[in-house]
Each structure stands twice: as C-alpha cells, then as structure tokens.
Design a protein with these regions (language model features):
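Acetyl-CoA-dependent GNAT
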Residues: 3, 7-13, 17-69, 73-75, ...
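Solvent-exposed beta-strand sheet faces enriched in polar/charged residues
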Residues: 58, 101, 121-124
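Short secondary-structure boundary/hinge segments and terminal tails
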Residues: 67, 94, 108, 130-132
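Residue-level recognition of the GNAT/N-acetyltransferase active site
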Residues: 73, 77, 101-103
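Glycine-rich phosphate-binding loop
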Residues: 80
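Conserved active-site alpha-helix within GNAT-family acetyltransferase domains
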Residues: 83, 105-122
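Conserved GNAT acetyl-CoA-binding A-motif
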Residues: 93-104
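C-terminal "cap" of GNAT-fold acetyltransferases
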Residues: 103, 126-144
Length: 144
C-alpha cells in the first residue's frame, strides 16, 4: 500500500471531516476544514484512492509559514505518511522559517518534526489546559 500526495480539492471536504478525530467532539473543526480548503493550502494523502490524511499550510502564525494541521487516520499513523504530507509544505513555504506546534502529549508528532529537522523553540500554555503546545521551527534559508 503506497501513499500518494496531492493538493486537496473542495470535494475532499467530506472525506477530511470523516477521518478527522476532532470533528465528532467539536463541530467547529468541520467549519475549520471548510475554511482551510477555501483559503489555505491543503494536501491530502491517499492509499488505494481513499483519503487517509491531510496537512494545512498558511501564514496564521505571526505571518510566518505555518503547518496549521496534520491529521492522519489512526490506522495509517507510523507509516511515514505524515512526512510525505509535510515535504511539499516545506517546498511551498515562502518565508525563511516554517513553524509548527504540537501538544506535549503528542510524542509521535514530536518525533516526526525532529526527523524533519524542526527544532523546539518555545511553548504556549493554556490552549489545552494541562497539555502545553510546543512550538517548533525549521530554518529553510537565511533571512535577509
């Protein structure tokens, strides 16, 4: 089972909402998915023509390149599909630095970011009480 990555289309909205683990708990996530598809750069990963993950790029983090979301179906985690989704976002990033955040509890994402040469550079408290958000950065090129 080989994963392929492509730009998302509006028609992918239902598939993204189905695989997103937050949608059942928080209906605002479905609206976020619609907004990302309309206004941001979204890539999807497919296995056997079925969407199994997605990644969102924008400039929502202090106008810097930002990976706003990486979501993979639980059955497809740990198979390097996250890496396949993040690589094109790095290529598209038009700022010298690319940022991403993840919860302290999300060890799998932390390992992925480290493997892709992101470096922890801070944290944000109180977004998810008791589970701070770690901020990561990857320097893509010299500033100036």
């Amino acid at each position: 089972m080989t994963a392929t990555v492509r730009r998302a289309r509006t028609a992918d909205a239902a598939a993204l909402k189905t695989l997103d683990t937050v949608v059942p708990e928080d209906p605002r996530r479905a609206a976020s998915i619609d907004a990302w598809l309309a206004h941001d750069i979204v890539f999807v990963a497919e296995v056997e023509d079925k969407v199994v993950g997605y990644a969102v790029f924008n400039h929502a983090f202090f106008r810097q390149g930002n990976i706003d979301m990486l979501m993979l179906h639980p059955d497809h985690r740990g198979k390097r599909i996250g890496e396949l989704l993040l690589r094109p976002l790095e290529s598209l990033c038009d700022t010298p630095k690319l940022f991403c955040t993840t919860n302290v509890s999300n060890h799998r994402m932390q390992r992925l970011l480290s493997r892709l040469e992101f470096v922890a550079c801070g944290f944000i408290d109180e977004l998810d009480p008791g589970d701070p958000e770690l901020v990561y950065v990857k320097k893509l090129r010299a500033e100036g």
